[in-house]
Regions:
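N-terminal subdomain of nucleotide-sugar transferases
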Residues: 1-12, 158-159
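Donor nucleotide-sugar binding/catalytic pocket of nucleotide-sugar-dependent glycosyltransferases
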Residues: 95-109, 113-130
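Nucleotide-sugar-dependent
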Residues: 189-228, 234-242
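Conserved catalytic-core segment of nucleotide-activated headgroup transferases in glycan assembly
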Residues: 126-194
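A charged, aromatic-enriched C-terminal amphipathic alpha-helix characteristic of glycosyltransferases
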Residues: 254-261, 268-302
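A short acidic/histidine/glycine-rich donor-binding loop in glycosyltransferase catalytic cores
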Residues: 247-253
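Extended catalytic core of nucleotide-activated donor transferases of GT-like folds
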Residues: 16-106
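Alpha-helix capping/helix-boundary segments
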Residues: 103-105, 149, 239-240, 258
Length: 302
């Protein structure tokens, strides 16, 4: 696509004087030419001030700036909420914003974002090939790829009659119910292969703060499960709920108890309909379709 990388590494910018910061940014932008457009992925996990200075410097080259918002730190951590005005100031320097969802767009506009051109990302791509040793089949099983301690999965499902596969390390000094199994950390390719065997992929949190952020952000887990070829189970408030429902990618529920009931009463024919729908988006995710379309749309909308 004719896009070159401008590499930014994470460091403590408080150690830089204003002149040192200018020199650092000049070095990062050494390959730029007048009129070049820049896609800036935010946050860079340095500081809002660094992002402001960086974008201001880019604009001196008389090109346009697309800010691709990967995450919004003031929404992720309660301790960072005070930084929201700083990040809104960063975003308002853009000629175009790429945001995770319609919900995120509405939220940022409500918080003061004034950029007129905004594009919705919707899904992360998973351009990874993996081995498919068998056909995906109906299993009364929920798979969860993530921190059990952070998301509270086993505690909520410990009395359930559904099998739960958690891709996290088994906790020490804890009695594990018979329906809960910990598989530890596995690499992405192995994870996709194992998920492909069947059942459902779970995107969930019992932590209300995290659940609220899921209403706005793009969960990488959604794409992981869809790329693996299995339907997903998520809360009705998830940011991509409309996509899931419209495309028959999985089950949207209010509670995990409701999810277990739906799964246990599902026929193999019903499950196969989900598999047929998911297989289409799995192919697109594996070929970077969403990212390519997103970037082309953004460039042409500038």
């Amino acid at each position: 696509m004719g896009i070159n990388e401008l590499a930014i590494f994470k460091y403590d910018d408080l150690t830089d004087s204003p002149s040192e910061l200018t020199k650092r940014i000049d070095g990062i932008l050494a390959g730029m030419e007048m009129g070049d457009n820049v896609i800036f992925q935010s946050p860079v996990w340095i500081s809002p001030e660094f992002e402001k200075r960086f974008i201001d410097k880019v604009k001196l080259y008389q090109g346009k700036v697309i800010i691709f918002i990967n995450d919004v730190p003031p929404m992720m951590f309660a301790s960072n909420e005070v930084l929201m005005p700083d990040f809104i100031e960063v975003y308002n320097k853009a000629d175009l914003l790429i945001v995770s969802s319609e919900n995120m767009k509405e939220y940022l506009v409500d918080k003061g974002a004034t950029v007129k051109k905004i594009i919705i990302q919707n899904l992360w791509d998973i351009p990874v090939e993996f081995e498919k040793t068998s056909e995906t089949k109906y299993l009364s099983k929920l798979s969860f790829a993530g921190s059990d301690k952070k998301f509270g999965i086993s505690e909520k499902l410990k009395s359930s009659d559904i099998k739960v596969e958690i891709y996290d390390n088994r906790p020490d000094n804890k009695v594990i119910p018979n329906n809960i199994h910990y598989s530890g950390y596995v690499d992405e390719i192995s994870l996709l292969s194992r998920l492909h065997e069947g059942g459902f992929g779970l995107i969930w949190s019992e932590d209300e703060y995290i659940k609220n952020y899921m209403h706005y952000c793009n969960s990488y887990k959604v794409s992981t499960y869809l790329r693996a070829g299995i339907p997903i189970v998520a809360h009705k408030s998830i940011s991509c709920a409309n996509l899931i429902e419209k495309n028959n990618w999985g089950i949207l529920v209010d509670t995990l108890e409701e999810a277990v009931e739906v799964i246990n009463n599902m026929s193999e024919e019903e499950y196969q309909k989900y598999i047929d729908s998911v297989s289409k988006v799995s192919f697109l995710l594996g070929n970077n379709w969403f990212t390519k379309k997103l970037l082309v749309d953004a460039i042409y909308k500038l």
